[in-house]
Amino acid sequence: MSSTEGGAKRVAEDGSEVSEAKRVGRIEGVAQLKPEYVVAGAAQLRAAESDEELTSERMVEPEGGTRKKSKKARGQNKNRDNRQAKEEHQLCPRLAQGNADACAFGAQCRYLHDVRTYLEHKTAEIECPQFTGCPVFAATGRCPMGFKCRFLSSHCNMETLELATTPEDERAKLWSVNHEVNHIASDRKLDLVKRRAPFPRSEHVLEIIDAIQQEFRDEMQGAAAAPEGAVAEVPQVQQREEQLSNKRARQRELYAQYHETRYFAQEKKPLDLHHKKIVSPLTTVGNLPFRRLMRQLGADVTYSEMALAVPLIQGTNSEWALPKAHCSELPGFGVQLACSKPWQAAKAAEALADNVGDGLSEINLNSGCPIDLLYRQGSGSALLDNPARMIRCLNAMNYVSKDVPVSVKLRTGTRDGHPIALGLCKRLVMETDVAAITLHGRTRQQRYTRSADWDYVGQVADALRSYETERAEKLKDREGKLRIQFVGNGDCNNWEDWYRHLENENVDSVMVARGALIKPWIFEEVDARQYIDKSSSERLEILRDYARFSMDHWGTDEYGIALCRRYFCEFMSFFHRYVPMGICERYPVLLNERPPNWRGRDDLETLLGSTDAADWIKLSEQFFGPTPDKFVFQPKHKSNSYAPSVQ
């Protein structure tokens, strides 16, 4: 941890301690900019940015009770609703490519079947400076949206309504470098929805875990005294007693067979994170287009947004969209899973391994998410308070995930002043077969109010290696385990931090989160070992790539463009926080430092640094055309809210 990050102290001549900030004559927590770029008459600092975990619509707690009096828009939008409206006049999806015979419903179909009627009601085509034609058609040789595309005239004869085609061999060449993977088959998903999908490995390992737990409970409670007298000769009672007796006999059999074994140990694909450039799992903003952008800019390992175990088991569409990845993410793509109980962990991991396992390098158990709703349900960082349950979840996942390695992401603890990661890591080494451990150097209670404690992260890394040596001695007569990968996480937003943290040889790599959102080219700096001052036009090109990847993923129809614009604004809520190196007196600017109000070196740079959500909307028009009146975007901070009626 750097001296500036930790607020290091120096001893003055009179023996008193002087903070590093005061020693070098700067204001602690404030970014130092060149005077000519500070906006005159605006001495106040920019509003504090919220770094709390974003909450997906999938995790919003429904509001209950009576309607409360409206309050002034302050603080965070805890229950944001950024769902976009769909077209009023919708063309039948089967006719999007022009095949009138494709719809089985015929005249009873609730969608339009007349293409010309649809085109009369369709929103006007997109006209924007960055894209003159359909970017999806240009990239893949085919536009899946067909007549619904907002760039339709670029791949359709508008007089004959004949869609353009690309030769098959050329399309195959384009597809080989630009397609998405990890799609679950529709019949498999339907089996999950109908609750008829089998989970044989999960059921077996849960039996083993239950048997070991039951034996432990019996030992703690002591043998129950035999009841006096005969069992009542009631058929139902006798049947239940017989079932319990058979179940207990089965549990004793499983306990005898497995309690002294590492039953969860399975042969896995090797997981190599050593000095890899890793992007953290990020809810909402860590979507496929962003991950694809980060791969293009040098990332080696990416993770899905956090997926919830129960909706995965139930075959929910929105949850099964999360494991999807771009082909450029392979190898090195992992799915992060949140759960509260071993049965959830086992069945979700088995479903992932069976349906998309070929496209996964690891399955990661989230034991660090601080979101209140998940914590109250026993998921995320709540598992830190129940290490035994976390271990059961990990062992169940490891047993069912075939050859896909299992990893875990932790925080230092749940409460300030009570770090538990050191002791927990010993149990993880001794009692599980995790392939990797990621430690975020903050507690749940701390959130982002102070810097990450990299001193503690280093202590845990050192202890982990000694625990591995101890385990090797204990299990010397058994097959040796691979070295557990240890990854540190927290506050890394420049190449100097990256290499400073890796000076500890026990730390395999550093995971980057906010640093990658604010400065996506951070891994280019890591490779070059120098700061790169991107111009406004270069940063606009990054946004152009993000917009193109978004349209590849969400589509170019009206609803797809609305989603692209919404997630573009979510990305801008972090991207705008970059303070250009050329306007700074001291660099780098730390994540917890707030700049004064500033102007850029040109108008575009000023626009890219705007904190106003309306400016993010304005910027999106360069890629997605004019913003429709029904577009909805609520940023996380209410003071930045944008509504069509307020221009």
From Swiss-Prot:
SUPFAM superfamilies: FMN-linked oxidoreductases. Its cofactor is FMN. It comes from the Eukaryota. The active site is at 369 (proton donor). Coiled coil: none annotated. One of its GO terms (cellular component) is cytoplasm. It catalyses: 5,6-dihydrouridine(47) in tRNA + NAD(+) = uridine(47) in tRNA + NADH + H(+); 5,6-dihydrouridine(47) in tRNA + NADP(+) = uridine(47) in tRNA + NADPH + H(+); a 5,6-dihydrouridine in mRNA + NAD(+) = a uridine in mRNA + NADH + H(+); a 5,6-dihydrouridine in mRNA + NADP(+) = a uridine in mRNA + NADPH + H(+). GO terms for molecular function: flavin adenine dinucleotide binding; mRNA dihydrouridine synthase activity; tRNA dihydrouridine synthase activity; tRNA-dihydrouridine47 synthase activity; zinc ion binding. A zinc finger (C3H1-type) spans 86-116, 122-158. Residues 67-77 have a biased composition (Basic residues). It is an enzyme of class 1 (oxidoreductase). Residues 7-26, 55-66, 78-89 have a biased composition (Basic and acidic residues). GO terms for biological process: mRNA processing. Keywords: Cytoplasm, Flavoprotein, FMN, Metal-binding, mRNA processing, NAD, NADP, Nucleus, Oxidoreductase, Repeat, tRNA processing, Zinc, Zinc-finger. It is found in: Cytoplasm; Nucleus. FMN binds at residues 281-283, 336, 409, 440, 489-491, 513-514. It holds the Pfam family Dus. Residues 1-26, 47-89 are annotated as: Disordered. Its EC number is 1.3.1.89, 1.3.1.-. Catalyzes the synthesis of dihydrouridine, a modified base found in the D-loop of most tRNAs. Specifically modifies U47 in cytoplasmic tRNAs. Catalyzes the synthesis of dihydrouridine in some mRNAs, thereby affecting their translation. Belongs to the Dus family. Dus3 subfamily. This is tRNA-dihydrouridine(47) synthase [NAD(P)(+)]. It comes from Eremothecium gossypii (strain ATCC 10895 / CBS 109.51 / FGSC 9923 / NRRL Y-1056) (Yeast). The gene is DUS3.
